[in-house]
């Protein structure tokens, strides 16, 4: 059905149809006069009477004029799904933007607006998702189909952890990953692509980018584009998929821009009145079903470090685990710089992960907490003034700190040390051994940047 543009206000375009009214979220293709430009897609956001609709553009609207012809597609934006999307970069409308070959015409396409799985379809059992990263598996374990918040400032290693997770999922669980770059820097997207290529994980991941420079419609809907690709692998292939969203804050931010452009009355701090329901709609689609699961890791930018800001606060309600990266730990040279006392997980309970794992995790945390409490005394009076039992706690805590570091596969290029995937049972055995005092006579440097405890013993032998 044809219509015509009647008004353009930045990324908001009003379109008039003759005797036809497109549905909300329907995609409208604009016929551009300049054939060299990519196609422009509008998405219906509101009905404004008299067969007119207000739409949000998924790309820049430069060169758009009144009276320009539009075609209603009869359905929402549809993006390619399946094996064809792996190793490629897509924009919000599902077109490849990596200068590679076109997506085959017979590739299946799914609508980006989908319902969340029903209660009957959802899986009720809680299972741990093993990542092979010691600090995560021991202290803040991820659950299959769970949502993890990744908190950290610039340059503390968020991207490296994301890439390591993609690597481990591909090689240990032979699963696929989907990465949605929501409103982040173009340079970071480019770097990530090349780093993945160098680390040999690219052919197991689909990338969807809606960068900072793009209009709010593209930045908002790109999260749905990526999620749709992940849902296909879960529902049709029965796989456990990893879904990365970097950055979930930008999803809320772009929604707020769209809301203002559409003239809705803002709510707290200028955010859209529908913030909680928009976030809920996205997050409810990320879950485990009887067929497979989508486990998501979402980087969360906290504006001005204010955790009560409505955008991060709306994310917290949905998270099952948090992985907090700490600059002080990174400064000590301990990578991954995960804060063992700040990171939390809903499934860190004896009923789900078992008594042994639970006791070891809590034991490690209590030793680290005691060490933290003693640091003021050490700074003022020095180690010699501590009691013998406190000296032992400090020695074990320092070993635990070093043992929480681990060489990554994707960082082999920079560090020169081969990456390690540590099975959960080895992680638990190693830390329990430190707590029990089995390794009190081994120097702490032997625990630094190794995999399992057997490597510590081998390293200690070499150091003699």
UniProtKB/Swiss-Prot annotation:
Domain of life: Bacteria
Reaction equation(s) it catalyzes: ATP + H2O + 4 H(+)(in) = ADP + phosphate + 5 H(+)(out)
EC top class named in words: translocase
InterPro entries associated with the record: AAA+_ATPase (IPR003593), ATP-synt_VA_C (IPR055190), ATP_synth_F1_bsu (IPR005722), ATPase_a/bsu_AS (IPR020003), ATPase_alpha/beta_chains (IPR050053), ATPase_F1/V1/A1_a/bsu_N (IPR004100), ATPase_F1/V1/A1_a/bsu_N_sf (IPR036121), ATPase_F1/V1/A1_a/bsu_nucl-bd (IPR000194)
Primary localization class, coarse: membrane
Enzyme Commission code(s) on record: 7.1.2.2
Gene Ontology molecular-function annotations: ATP binding; ATP hydrolysis activity; proton-transporting ATP synthase activity, rotational mechanism
Membrane topology: Peripheral membrane protein
Family note: Belongs to the ATPase alpha/beta chains family.
Subunit structure: F-type ATPases have 2 components, CF(1) - the catalytic core - and CF(0) - the membrane proton channel. CF(1) has five subunits: alpha(3), beta(3), gamma(1), delta(1), epsilon(1). CF(0) has three main subunits: a(1), b(2) and c(9-12). The alpha and beta chains form an alternating ring which encloses part of the gamma chain. CF(1) is attached to CF(0) by a central stalk formed by the gamma and epsilon chains, while a peripheral stalk is formed by the delta and b chains.
Name of protein: ATP synthase subunit beta
Taxonomic path: Bacteria, Pseudomonadati, Campylobacterota, Epsilonproteobacteria, Campylobacterales
Gene designation per UniProt: atpD
């Amino acid at each position: 059905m044809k219509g015509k543009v009647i008004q353009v206000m930045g990324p908001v375009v009003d379109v008039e149809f003759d005797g036809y009214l497109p549905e909300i979220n329907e995609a409208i293709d604009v016929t551009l006069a300049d054939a060299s430009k990519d196609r422009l897609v509008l998405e219906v956001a509101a009905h404004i009477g008299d067969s007119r609709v207000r739409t949000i553009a998924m790309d820049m609207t430069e060169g758009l004029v009144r009276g320009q012809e539009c075609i209603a597609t009869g359905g929402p934006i549809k993006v390619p799904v399946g094996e064809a999307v792996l190793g490629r970069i897509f924009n919000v409308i599902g077109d490849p933007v990596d200068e590679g070959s076109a997506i085959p015409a017979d590739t299946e396409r799914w609508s980006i607006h989908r319902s969340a799985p029903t209660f009957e379809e959802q899986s009720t059992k809680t299972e741990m998702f093993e990542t092979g990263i010691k600090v995560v598996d021991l202290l803040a374990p991820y659950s299959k189909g769970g949502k993890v918040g990744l908190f950290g400032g610039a340059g503390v290693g968020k991207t490296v952890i994301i890439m390591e997770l993609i690597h481990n999922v591909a090689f240990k669980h032979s699963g696929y990953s989907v990465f949605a770059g929501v409103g982040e820097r173009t340079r970071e997207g480019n770097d990530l692509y090349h780093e993945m290529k160098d680390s040999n994980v690219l052919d197991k991941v689909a990338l969807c980018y809606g960068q900072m420079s793009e209009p709010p419609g593209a930045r908002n809907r790109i999260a749905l584009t990526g999620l749709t690709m992940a849902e296909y692998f879960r529902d049709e292939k029965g796989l456990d998929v990893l879904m990365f969203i970097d950055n979930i804050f930008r999803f809320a931010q772009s929604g707020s821009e769209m809301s203002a452009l559409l003239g809705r009355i803002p709510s707290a701090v200028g955010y859209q009145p529908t913030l909680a329901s928009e976030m809920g709609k996205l997050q409810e689609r990320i879950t485990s079903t009887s067929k497979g699961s989508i486990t998501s890791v979402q980087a969360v930018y906290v504006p001005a470090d204010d955790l009560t800001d409505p955008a991060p606060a709306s994310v917290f309600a949905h998270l099952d685990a948090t992985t907090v990266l700490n600059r002080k730990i990174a400064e000590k040279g301990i990578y991954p710089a995960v804060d063992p006392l700040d990171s939390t997980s809903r499934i860190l309970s004896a009923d789900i992960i078992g008594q042994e794992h639970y006791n070891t995790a809590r034991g490690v945390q209590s030793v680290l907490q005691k060490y933290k409490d003693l640091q003021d005394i050490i700074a003022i009076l020095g180690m010699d003034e501590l009691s013998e039992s406190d000296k032992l706690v400090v020695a074990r805590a320092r070993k635990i700190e070093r043992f929480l570091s681990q060489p990554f596969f994707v960082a082999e290029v920079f560090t020169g040390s081969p990456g390690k995937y540590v099975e959960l049972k080895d992680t638990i055995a190693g830390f329990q051994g430190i707590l029990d005092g089995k390794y009190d006579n081994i120097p702490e440097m032997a625990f630094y940047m190794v995999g399992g405890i057997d490597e510590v013993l081998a390293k200690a032998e070499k150091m003699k």
